[in-house]
């Protein structure tokens, strides 16, 4: 025995069964924590193929990542309208790192025998890693810190559940709590369809 110490890596999401899911993680990745967190939030809950296409589009700047939490001093773009925000960016490096992790998780799912065409991003989390410390030299002999903000990423893919159609009487009961504006829109829609 070479003295190898294999231990179970802990994921933040404990309630997802390992048999029906595929996991991937990256540690101490040299990519911006804030950009990666916003990009990860954008793909959370997406189907795998849609998430891969979205990240490719972000790299090509045809789709945009909405910035909600870390949105200070961020410029506005019209592409953010599809997410209902004005502040949005195209974090290419974060998109590439997440693409690589998604492809790794997809390969893990294929190895486990899961249906790769039916996978969704069930859990994705970005944590801060220890900051890299360098220095930059300023005027008058001063020195300022020149920090990097790397991150750890973990994600879990699961097979999507089949959606069951609600019974018509249940759908009608839900309509009881509509505002007058929603009821009016519903009536207009019914008139247009008739």
Curated annotation (Swiss-Prot):
InterPro entries: Ribosomal_uL22 (IPR001063), Ribosomal_uL22_CS (IPR018260), Ribosomal_uL22_euk/arc (IPR005721), Ribosomal_uL22_sf (IPR036394). One of its GO terms (molecular function) is structural constituent of ribosome. It comes from Aspergillus fumigatus (strain ATCC MYA-4609 / CBS 101355 / FGSC A1100 / Af293). Keywords: Ribonucleoprotein, Ribosomal protein. Signal peptide: none annotated. This is Large ribosomal subunit protein uL22. GO terms for biological process: cytoplasmic translation. Belongs to the universal ribosomal protein uL22 family. The gene is rpl17. GO terms for cellular component: cytosolic large ribosomal subunit.
């Amino acid at each position: 025995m070479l003295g190898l110490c294999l231990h179970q890596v802990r994921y933040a999401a404990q309630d997802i069964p390992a048999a029906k899911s595929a996991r991937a993680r990256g540690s101490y990745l040299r990519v911006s924590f804030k950009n990666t967190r916003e990009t990860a939030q954008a793909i959370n809950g997406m189907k795998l193929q849609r998430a891969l296409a979205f990240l490719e589009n972000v790299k090509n700047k045809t789709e945009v990542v909405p910035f909600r939490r870390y949105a200070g001093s961020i410029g506005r773009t019209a592409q953010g309208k599809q997410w209902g925000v004005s502040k949005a960016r195209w974090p290419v490096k974060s998109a590439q790192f997440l693409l690589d992790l998604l492809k790794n998780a997809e390969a893990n799912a294929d190895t486990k025998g899961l249906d790769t065409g039916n996978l969704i991003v069930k859990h994705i989390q970005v944590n801060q890693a220890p900051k890299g410390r360098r220095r930059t030299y300023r005027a008058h002999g001063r020195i300022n810190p020149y920090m990097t903000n790397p991150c750890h990423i973990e994600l879990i893919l699961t097979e999507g559940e089949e959606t069951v159609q609600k019974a018509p009487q249940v759908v009608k009961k839900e309509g009881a709590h509509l505002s007058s504006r929603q009821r009016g829109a519903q009536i207009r829609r019914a008139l247009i369809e008739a």
